[in-house]
Amino acid sequence: MPKLKTKSGVKKRFKFTASGKVKHGVAGKRHRLISHNSKYIRTNRGTSVLSEADAAHVRLWAPYGLK
């Protein structure tokens, strides 16, 4: 049986933690930030952890995990 390929979009967008949780960047931070207040920009900095329901889909698309 051939090896399963990881979806290329998943490689670019997600990382797995050591405990198996899935981290992702917060959406809506590329441009037009002048209309948002400083608190919104500050709290959406960095990464977040996906919910378990969404993480299950990502794990299907990355069969061997990501570093």
Curated annotation (Swiss-Prot):
GO biological process, one term: translation
SUPFAM superfamilies, A to Z: L35p-like
Swiss-Prot/TrEMBL keywords: Ribonucleoprotein, Ribosomal protein
InterPro entries: Ribosomal_bL35 (IPR001706), Ribosomal_bL35-like (IPR021137), Ribosomal_bL35_CS (IPR018265), Ribosomal_bL35_sf (IPR037229)
Gene3D superfamilies in the record: 4.10.410.60
GO cellular component: cytosolic large ribosomal subunit
GO molecular function: structural constituent of ribosome
UniProt similarity note: Belongs to the bacterial ribosomal protein bL35 family.
Protein name: Large ribosomal subunit protein bL35
